[in-house]
Design a protein with these regions (language model features):
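N-terminal, membrane-interfacial amphipathic/helix-forming hydrophobic leader that caps
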Residues: 1-76, 80-87, 98, 203-211
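Functionally important transmembrane alpha-helices
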Residues: 23-28, 159, 170-211
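Alpha-helical transmembrane segments and their helix-entry boundary regions
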Residues: 10, 14, 66, 154-155, ...
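Membrane-interface helix/loop boundary segments of multi-pass membrane proteins
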Residues: 135-156, 186-190
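Membrane-embedded alpha-helical segments of multi-pass membrane proteins
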Residues: 43-51, 119, 123, 172-180
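Transmembrane helix interruption/hinge and helix-loop junction motifs
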Residues: 34-36, 149, 165-170, 189
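Juxtamembrane helix-loop-helix connectors linking adjacent transmembrane helices
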Residues: 63-129, 147
């Protein structure tokens, strides 16, 4: 019982860390901090938050979906995860545009402008954000919803939460990404594999957008 309470407390503090980071932008705006100081603070905040969340993952130990894996196994699944995520993103994005006449991803374009203006912000966008999102939406939400529901319902709920958080015009693309990364997490049995795939995918999409 004490072990369960300790795990639940760990998950709570992981989620709280993420919420505090998401609130940082609002706090900085209220303090009228803008421009470079604003993005420097967000970047540093994201590094601290991601580091703390990684520490909390290590502290909690593996959950029911996780096993100790080899580097070769992890690299193979990162490649599968990245290629699948990129292909799925373009496929669903094309279908979404064709059927619903949705515009380009407002979220991607906004991040692109920020990274162009403040290059160091890529640390947040390409590295810290994917790590934190995988820990929150796959390890905290998805993994903890599997037992009270089932793996499919858990994946759908966590994917919709992931899409809702991004507040983007291409909602279906983010739902698909959420489902795909849940699949990669389940199959690889390692949260850092889905995080690695997410990092490489973000880097690829933003690099292609810049070119």
């Amino acid at each position: 019982m004490e072990e369960i309470m300790s795990y639940q407390k760990n998950q709570f503090f992981t989620l709280l860390t993420y919420i505090v980071l998401l609130s940082l932008g609002t706090i900085l705006s209220l303090l009228k901090i803008t421009g470079s100081p604003y993005f420097i603070a967000l970047t540093i905040g994201s590094i601290v938050a991601a580091g703390l969340m990684i520490y909390l993952v290590k502290l909690s130990g593996p959950n029911d979906l996780e096993e100790k894996t080899t580097l070769n196994h992890d690299l193979q699944w990162i490649i599968v995860g990245t290629v699948g995520a990129i292909a799925l993103q373009y496929l669903i994005g094309f279908a979404d545009q064709l059927i619903f006449h949705s515009t380009s991803s407002a979220n991607t374009m906004s991040l692109l402008l920020m990274v162009k203006a403040y290059p160091y912000y890529f640390i947040y966008v390409m590295i810290a954000a994917p790590i934190m999102e995988e820990i929150i939406f796959r390890r905290v939400f998805f993994a903890n919803l599997v037992k009270p529901t089932n793996i499919y319902i858990a994946a759908i709920i966590s994917a919709f939460l992931f899409a809702f958080m991004h507040q983007d015009t291409r909602f279906l693309v983010y739902v698909a990404m959420g489902l795909w990364f849940s699949f990669i997490y389940t199959k690889s049995e390692n949260i850092y594999v889905s995080a690695g795939s997410h990092i490489v995918m973000n880097a690829f999409v933003l690099t292609m957008a810049i070119m």
